[in-house]
């Protein structure tokens, strides 16, 4: 059933209020809408609602604040599980996303728990950048009355493993905070470490925070996000791939695919800005090559999560083969006594470099050894899903979800190598074939609720994906706000992703401006950050008019270069020094007017 929106003249809300209401309720289920309706009825009639009970004074019961700083959702899931544990222990707890935390109140926190991941080259998650910057600034307060604990999630295949957690932990201590527990740094397989840490936190806090009354334990932040979808990272939807289209030219150095996935009647919902999680299977040819290099058959039985499987099946479905790590290299060297690899052990930088440049199968090829099947399995990490920025809006595509996939391809001594998930989608799933997917919601990359707000989108390469979703949504909403796109890639003729669609949006007036940077079409390389500087005066006018700025793409280089260009534009045309420009951009971030989806 479709609910018709009544004419605006009959509504007691102005257009801006209506837009905010629609944005806040667009992804709610009927059950959630019913609860919201009852909540507002209770407010109107001054009746108590289950989640609006007044907590006891802080003097009687010190509150526990959990700050969740998540990039891919894992840190948020750990924080939510801890909140539930503390509520079950009848403790007064509040869970807040780092992007929503009013960080100036940190001085009044008595019991503070931080759960954080790390992105890029050791940076905090996007939603925690402002808090991180505040704590490391001269404005950070003393925290002598604060006890804290930090749980850090990371990936040991990266050089700056768990750096964000290390930063928060050391800075909170430096500001005078008392450690409740030593920091825990967890790898990709974080679940066991998180479970143990949560139990220790609950035990530590029981002695610090008196037990809350039943009404208090319900009232103090038990609600953060309510997900009623039956599909999740651990229980994905089995959908079907309906379109796999190469959208770069035949002479392009890049292989970029437009992928469409049919969600059927699953009811799975997403918003522009969300990501699609994809569970993939390793290439059977890669599995066969690795097994044969180790003088195994692939039929050997191995144990995976309590189940006995043939080695080939375990490697294809359950273990990471396309990402090597320093730990794997070190363990393989020690296990096999490899003369080639043992000299690397103890040298973190060399181990990291070798792992970053050498696939597991090539490590085995270059340093051959014989391992039994269980030893191989124990060496590897569990397979994890890959996240892709969603390139569609359900306002246009309904029961579909689109993604833009840059396929990773390269050669090693004449042998073709490819990325695990990208080659799975591009090469190994037939049309109408099955794909296991889930939605990773990202409330830190959202279109403005006010449809009149101007939007500036900066997305070179596959970073264009969410802005296709943005434009579909803005067109469907008939949003009067202006839209400006900055896009870049090597060549105009080969790499202009979704060219016809952008031209149509310009013709229809949906896309107000488009600035393009082709880095290889002339002698001097030109990137999107150069276009930002070139259009600095107009860019500053848009910012002064309230524009929201969005950046999507590579975290390590592009995002940093774009941010530097924005700072230069703000300083030059806003008449500010470097420090003031940095403060101005930080304020835009806090106001959700500067949002990034970087990876």
Swiss-Prot record:
Keyword field contains Lipoprotein: no
Cellular component terms per the entry's GO annotation: cytosol
Residue intervals of the FAD-binding FR-type domain: 234-448
Keywords on record: Amino-acid biosynthesis, Cysteine biosynthesis, Electron transport, FAD, Flavoprotein, FMN, NADP, Oxidoreductase, Transport
InterPro entries linked: CysJ, CysJ-like_FAD-binding, CysJ_Proteobact, FAD-bd_FR_type, Flavdoxin-like, Flavodoxin/NO_synth, Flavoprot_Pyr_Nucl_cyt_Rdtase, Flavoprotein-like_sf
EC number: 1.8.1.2
Ligand binding (NADP(+)): 519-520, 525-529, 561
Binding site for FMN: 70-75, 117-120, 153-162
Taxonomic superkingdom: Bacteria
Record GO biological process: cysteine biosynthetic process; hydrogen sulfide biosynthetic process; sulfate assimilation
Enzyme class: oxidoreductase
Residues reported in the UniProt entry to bind FAD: 322, 356, 386-389, 404-406, 410, 419-422, 599
Cofactor detail note: Binds 1 FAD per subunit.
Protein's UniProt keywords contain Transferase: no
Pathway given in the UniProt record: Sulfur metabolism; hydrogen sulfide biosynthesis; hydrogen sulfide from sulfite (NADPH route): step 1/1
Assembly and oligomerization: Alpha(8)-beta(8). The alpha component is a flavoprotein, the beta component is a hemoprotein.
Function in brief: Component of the sulfite reductase complex that catalyzes the 6-electron reduction of sulfite to sulfide. This is one of several activities required for the biosynthesis of L-cysteine from sulfate. The flavoprotein component catalyzes the electron flow from NADPH -> FAD -> FMN to the hemoprotein component.
Matching HAMAP family: CysJ
Listed NCBIfam families: cysJ, PRK06214.1, PRK10953.1
Family: Belongs to the NADPH-dependent sulphite reductase flavoprotein subunit CysJ family. In the N-terminal section; belongs to the flavodoxin family.
Listed name of the protein: Sulfite reductase [NADPH] flavoprotein alpha-component
Organism: Shigella flexneri
Upper taxonomic lineage: Bacteria, Pseudomonadati, Pseudomonadota, Gammaproteobacteria, Enterobacterales
């Amino acid at each position: 059933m479709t609910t018709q929106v009544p004419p605006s003249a009959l509504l007691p809300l102005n257009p801006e209020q209506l837009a905010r209401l629609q944005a806040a309720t667009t992804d709610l289920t009927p059950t959630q809408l019913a609860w919201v309706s009852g909540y507002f009825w209770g407010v109107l009639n001054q009746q108590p609602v289950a989640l609006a009970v007044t907590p006891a004074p802080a003097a009687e019961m010190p509150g526990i604040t959990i700050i969740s700083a998540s990039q891919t959702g894992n840190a948020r899931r750990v924080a939510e599980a801890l909140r539930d544990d503390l509520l079950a222990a009848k403790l007064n707890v509040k869970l807040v996303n780092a992007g929503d935390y009013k960080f100036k109140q940190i001085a009044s926190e008595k019991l503070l728990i931080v759960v954080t991941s790390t992105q890029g080259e050791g940076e905090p998650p996007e939603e925690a950048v402002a808090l991180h910057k505040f704590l490391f600034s001269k404005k950070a307060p003393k925290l002598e009355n604060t006890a804290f604990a930090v749980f850090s999630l990371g990936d040991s295949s990266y050089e700056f493993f768990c750096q964000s957690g290390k930063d928060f932990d050391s800075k909170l201590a430096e500001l005078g905070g008392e450690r409740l527990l030593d920091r825990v740094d967890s790898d990709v397989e974080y679940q066991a470490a998180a479970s143990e840490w949560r139990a220790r936190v609950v035990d530590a806090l029981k002695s610090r925070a008196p037990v809350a009354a039943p009404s208090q334990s319900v009232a103090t932040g038990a609600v953060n996000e309510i997900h009623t979808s039956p599909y999740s990272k651990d229980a994905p939807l089995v959908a079907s791939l309906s379109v796999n289209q190469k959208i770069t030219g035949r002479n392009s150095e890049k292989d970029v695919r437009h992928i469409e996935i049919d969600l059927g009647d699953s009811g799975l919902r997403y918003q522009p800005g969300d990501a699609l999680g994809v569970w993939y299977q390793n290439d059977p040819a890669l599995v066969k090559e690795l097994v044969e290099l180790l003088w195994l058959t692939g039929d050997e039985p191995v144990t995976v999560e309590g189940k006995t499987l043939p080695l080939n099946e375990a490697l294809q479905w359950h273990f990471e083969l396309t990402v090597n790590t320093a730990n794997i290299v070190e363990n393989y060297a020690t296990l096999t006594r490899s003369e080639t690899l043992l000299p690397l052990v103890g040298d973190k930088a060399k181990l990291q470099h070798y792992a970053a440049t050498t696939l597991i199968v090539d490590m085995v090829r270059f340093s051959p050894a014989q391992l039994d099947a269980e030893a191989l399995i124990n060496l590897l990490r569990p397979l994890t899903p890959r996240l892709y920025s969603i390139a569609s809006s359900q306002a246009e595509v309904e029961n579909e979800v689109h993604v833009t996939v840059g396929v990773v391809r390269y050669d090693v001594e004449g042998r073709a190598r490819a990325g695990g998930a990208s080659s799975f989608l591009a090469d190994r799933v037939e049309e109408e074939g099955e794909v296991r997917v889930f939605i990773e919601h990202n409330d830190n990359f959202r279109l403005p609720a006010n449809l009149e707000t101007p939007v500036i989108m900066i997305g070179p390469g596959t970073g264009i994906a969410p802005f296709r979703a943005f434009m579909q949504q803005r067109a469907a909403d008939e949003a009067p706000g202006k839209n400006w796109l900055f896009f870049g890639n090597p060549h105009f003729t080969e790499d202009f992703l979704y060219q016809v669609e952008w031209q149509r949006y310009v013709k229809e007036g949906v896309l107000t401006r488009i600035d393009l940077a082709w880095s290889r079409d002339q002698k001097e390389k030109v990137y999107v950050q150069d276009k930002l500087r070139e259009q600095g005066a107009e860019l500053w006018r848009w910012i002064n008019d309230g524009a929201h700025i969005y950046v999507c793409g590579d975290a390590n280089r592009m995002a940093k270069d774009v941010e530097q260009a924005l700072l230069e534009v703000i300083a030059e045309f806003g008449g500010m020094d470097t420090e003031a420009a940095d403060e101005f951009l930080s304020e835009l971030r806090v106001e959700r007017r500067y949002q990034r989806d970087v990876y």
